[in-house]
């Protein structure tokens, strides 16, 4: 019999953070770096825990080179060849601590990932990425990768509920990607009717992960620096961004003009565009679950990085958190009916 869960679930747009008394004199005093030791790999990582999504428009080597300068992380998309990786490792050895190799859950994916990790042993992060992290096959794949790479830190997802977070952590994953359908170019919710409001998903999944000394990534749903702050406030250890990093010089694809405006393409990894490019088209048994959009060309990503980090520091000063680590402890969310004044939007 169908069941209705009557508990209210909230998204970033449904809340604001309540300001609190603060002893901080300036945003400059806020420390955004975090240090994590991961449950299964036992590896330690230090940096600003914002990750560029492993989408082939934004998760590029060019993006990783800039992100690394800010101690930020990039999940490199899975469509680079072994030779591409070797060239990147030769030209940018300083970036290799701040990138992950991405893989699907197929045999070909595993073989390609293995060859990359053997050729570039400095890379210690693996991102196992499937649209539906609830399949038994994926859980078994995580166990297989953990057995094969016992000292690599494994990110795995995507899921949105605590019981699956726990299962993936106990199967060998260190960091669980949380989010089904919130992305700016994702249409899973409209095509399938499946999803979970991102703020509630993060709060619930963080609680489950932290109880096992695991970690989570809030993946998708951020439209502005304030949403990034809300994700951290909700308990996310890392926040993964795709759309907010789209349209920059460091993104894949050419700049083109339409009606006098400079634009770049940005598309979901389950879109017609991505499947035509990488899988020879959309298989007849499935539907596209992503969209392709033309986004304004924004120039170098440096300004966007500074805007996000500046907003995050400002959030911390408003709630009295001297470190990003303290933000979730200082966060009180209030439900609202309006986010901001829209007169000049």
Swiss-Prot record:
Which keywords has UniProt assigned to this entry? Answer: Metal-binding, NADP, Oxidoreductase, Potassium, Purine metabolism
Q: What EC number(s) does its UniProt record assign?
A: 1.7.1.7
Q: Which GO terms describe its biological process?
A: purine nucleobase metabolic process; purine nucleotide metabolic process; response to cold
Any one GO MF term held by the record is:
metal ion binding
Which positions does UniProt annotate for K(+) binding? 181, 183, 186, 189
InterPro entries (alphabetical): Aldolase_TIM, GMP_reductase, GMPR, IMP_DH/GMP_Rdtase_CS, IMP_DH_GMPRt
Which residues participate in NADP(+) binding?
Answer: 26-27, 78, 129-131, 180-181, 269, 285-286, 314-317
Q: Which GO terms describe its cellular component?
A: cytosol; GMP reductase complex
Q: Report the enzyme's class at the first EC level.
A: oxidoreductase
Q: Which domain of life is it from?
A: Eukaryota
Sites where the protein binds GMP: 219-221, 242-243, 268-270, 286-290
Q: Which reaction does it catalyse?
A: IMP + NH4(+) + NADP(+) = GMP + NADPH + 2 H(+)
Q: Where is the active site?
A: 186, 188
Query: What job does the chain carry out?
Result: Catalyzes the irreversible NADPH-dependent deamination of GMP to IMP. It functions in the conversion of nucleobase, nucleoside and nucleotide derivatives of G to A nucleotides, and in maintaining the intracellular balance of A and G nucleotides.
HAMAP family in the cross-refs: GMP_reduct_type1
Assembly, in brief, is:
Homotetramer.
UniProt record similarity statement: Belongs to the IMPDH/GMPR family. GuaC type 1 subfamily.
Name of the protein described by the UniProt record: GMP reductase 1
What gene is this protein a product of? GMPR
């Amino acid at each position: 019999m169908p069941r209705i869960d009557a508990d209210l679930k909230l998204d970033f747009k449904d809340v604001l953070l309540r300001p609190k008394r603060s002893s901080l004199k300036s945003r400059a005093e806020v420390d955004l770096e975090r240090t994590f030791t991961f449950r299964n790999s036992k590896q330690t990582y230090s940096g600003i825990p914002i990750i560029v999504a492993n989408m082939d428009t934004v998760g590029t080597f060019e993006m990783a080179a800039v992100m690394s300068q800010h101690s930020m992380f990039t999940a490199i998309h899975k469509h680079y060849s072994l030779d591409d990786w070797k060239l990147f490792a030769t030209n940018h050895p300083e970036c290799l601590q701040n990138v992950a190799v991405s893989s699907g859950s197929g045999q070909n994916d595993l073989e390609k990932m293995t060859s990359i990790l053997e050729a570039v042993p400095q890379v210690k992060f693996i991102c196992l990425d499937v649209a539906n992290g609830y399949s038994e096959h994926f859980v078994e794949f995580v166990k297989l990768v953990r057995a094969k790479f016992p000292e690599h830190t494994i990110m795995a997802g995507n899921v949105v509920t605590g019981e699956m977070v726990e299962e993936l952590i106990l199967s060998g994953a260190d960091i669980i990607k949380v989010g089904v359908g919130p992305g700016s170019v994702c249409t899973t919710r409209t095509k399938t009717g499946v999803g979970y409001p991102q703020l509630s998903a993060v709060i619930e999944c963080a609680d489950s992960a932290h109880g096992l000394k695991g970690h989570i990534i809030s993946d998708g749903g951020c439209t502005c620096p304030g949403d990034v702050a809300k994700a951290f406030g909700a308990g996310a250890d890392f926040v993964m961004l795709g759309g907010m990093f789209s349209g920059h010089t460091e993104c894949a694809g050419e700049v083109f003009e339409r009606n006098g405006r400079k634009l770049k393409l940005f598309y979901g990894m389950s879109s017609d565009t991505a499947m035509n490019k990488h899988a020879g088209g959309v298989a007849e048994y499935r539907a596209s679950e992503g969209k392709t959009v033309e986004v304004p060309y924004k120039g170098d990503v440096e300004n966007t990085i500074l805007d996000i980090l500046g907003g995050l520091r400002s959030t911390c000063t408003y709630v009295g958190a001297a470190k990003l680590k303290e933000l979730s402890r200082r966060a009180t969310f209030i439900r609202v009916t309006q986010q901001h004044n829209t007169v000049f939007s």
